[in-house]
Structures are given as C-alpha cells and as structure tokens.
C-alpha cells in the first residue's frame, strides 16, 4: 500500500520547502531591483519575470523536498530510535518508496530549472548532488557538513537571482556569501550546543573532534567575516544608504552572537542572536535598493 499525500508532504518537510522557495523569490526580487537600478547599458532585466519566478519557486520547493526525503532515507536507523514517528520508521512509507520519491522530485525540480535557463538548471543539478552527498556522507563529516548547510541555504538566493543569468548571480553574490557565512557559523554553534547529546549518540561533529573552545573560535571567525564583508554592496554601489544603516543592526547582532559565544560561553543564546542578525541582514537587502 502506497503512502498517503500527507505522508509525502511530511517526508518533504513542506514547511521548510516553502521557506526555501520564498527565499528564492526574494533573491529574484532583490536581483531585479539591483539590476533595474544599476543595470549597465548592455544589460536590462526588462519587466519582472513573474512566470519564471513561479517556476523557480517550484524548482526550489521540489529540490529541497527531495533533499529532505533522501535525508530520511539515509537516517532510517537513527530515526527509528530518536524519531520513530517519522514516515519511514513508523511504517507509513516504505524505504524504497522514499528513495524513488526523492529521485523523482530531484528530476522534476532540475528539469523545471533547466526550462528557465541553463544556469538555473546547473545550480539545481549541483545542489541535488550536494544534497544526496550530504545525506549519505557529509552530514557526518565535521565542518564539511556545516559548510554544506551554509552553501545550500545561501544558494536559495542565488537560485532566484539566476533567473537573470550571470548578471543576476553577480548582483546577489554578496548576499549569498553573507548568508552562507552566517549559516555556517550558526551550524557550528548549534553543534557546540548539542555536544552532550551528540556524544551519547556517537555523532562525529567539529566540537567533539577539536573541542568546544576551538570550534567556538572558528565560528566566531566565520561570523566576523560576515561582518567585514557586509558593507561591500554599499561600497560597490549595488545598494544604497538604507542598506548600510540596516546592515549595521545585523552586524551588531553578529557581534553580540560572537560575544555570547566567546565571553559568556552561551552557545544557545549565541545561536538565537545569529538567527536574529540574519533576519536583519535580509531586511537590509530588501530595503536597501
């Protein structure tokens, strides 16, 4: 007996897929605004690509859902202990069914992306491979797993910007970089926060490998790089003064997160501060055009 529609949506973690899709739309909007305001004479984005935006949303939604489904496929043993209510360990979905479902979503999402333009398609294909490799291997690899999450999260914005080809990627590269750095730093902080539980489960994370102190220094360094690079869009004349003012709030949040991590030894509060800072950084990009 095949799984229900509700079970398929559950294994996709459709709420996360919606967030990833909307992040791509935000990337399209920001890239469009930047290119419209600062477009070189040889390039103009024209009218806002509404139809392509719908396609990019669907492509990101499907690829993200595929990544979540295949993650459950490889995590079936762990989930049978920690999350027995998940679709596979609960018996509501067969193991092979989850695998075939994820491959179908990967294929549909990638085909949709290629229908927009080759750059969108290449990003979809590459991200699909990263998601498969992450679920199978990278998730249990110290630092590389954190970097993978940072890249994949930040690439949602690049995905949306790729509607405009290479010019779109150039316009959104700094936002991608800031998001990737901030997410990577926060992922390391979360691993520090979860050290006791991860140790009991036999997980191999960066803090368990090198110690909480060294991992904290690395997370702080990566977060500080996000602060250093944050004024770049203003200095490159991509975004205006509003961006600079608003991103300063984000920078204060990043610095507060670093302070909580290093001076107060409070990874839980640091993780929350990183999340708040990323929200202000996103607002700065939206409002800064």
From Swiss-Prot:
GO cellular component: plasma membrane
Catalytic reaction list: sn-3-O-(geranylgeranyl)glycerol 1-phosphate + (2E,6E,10E)-geranylgeranyl diphosphate = 2,3-bis-O-(geranylgeranyl)-sn-glycerol 1-phosphate + diphosphate
CDD domains membership: PT_UbiA_DGGGPS
Co-factor(s): Mg(2+)
Pfam families: UbiA
Keywords assigned by UniProt, alphabetized: Cell membrane, Lipid biosynthesis, Lipid metabolism, Magnesium, Membrane, Phospholipid biosynthesis, Phospholipid metabolism, Transferase, Transmembrane, Transmembrane helix
The family this protein is said to belong to: Belongs to the UbiA prenyltransferase family. DGGGP synthase subfamily.
Protein name, as recorded: Digeranylgeranylglyceryl phosphate synthase
Native source organism of the sequence: Methanosarcina barkeri (strain Fusaro / DSM 804)
Lineage of the species this protein comes from: Archaea, Methanobacteriati, Methanobacteriota, Stenosarchaea group, Methanomicrobia
């Amino acid at each position: 007996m095949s799984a229900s529609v509700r079970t398929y949506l559950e294994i996709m973690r459709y709420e996360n897929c919606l967030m990833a899709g909307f992040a791509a739309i935000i990337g399209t909007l920001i890239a469009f605004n930047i290119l419209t305001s600062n477009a070189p004479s040889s390039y103009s984005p024209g009218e806002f690509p509404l139809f392509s935006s719908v396609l990019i949303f669907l492509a990101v939604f499907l690829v993200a859902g595929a990544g979540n489904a295949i993650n459950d496929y490889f995590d079936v043993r762990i989930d049978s202990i920690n999350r027995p209510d998940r679709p596979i360990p609960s018996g509501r979905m067969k193991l092979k069914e989850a695998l075939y479902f994820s491959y179908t979503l990967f294929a549909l999402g990638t085909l949709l992306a290629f229908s927009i333009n080759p750059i969108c398609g290449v990003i979809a294909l590459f991200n699909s491979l990263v998601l498969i490799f992450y679920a199978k291997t990278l998730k249990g690899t110290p630092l590389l797993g954190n970097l993978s999450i940072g890249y994949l999260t930040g690439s949602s914005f690049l995905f949306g910007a790729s509607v405009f080809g290479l010019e779109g990627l150039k316009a959104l590269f700094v936002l991608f970089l800031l998001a990737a750095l901030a997410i990577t730093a926060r992922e390391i902080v979360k691993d520090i926060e979860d050290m006791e539980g991860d140790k009991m489960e036999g997980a191999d994370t960066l803090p368990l490998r090198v110690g909480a102190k060294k991992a904290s220094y690395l997370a702080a360094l990566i977060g500080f790089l996000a602060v250093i690079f944050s004024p770049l869009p203003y200095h490159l004349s991509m975004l205006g003064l509003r961006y600079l003012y608003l991103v300063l709030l984000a920078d204060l949040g990043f610095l507060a997160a670093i302070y909580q991590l290093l001076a107060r030894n409070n990874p839980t509060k640091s993780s929350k501060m990183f999340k708040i800072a990323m929200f202000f950084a996103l607002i700065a990009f939206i409002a800064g055009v």
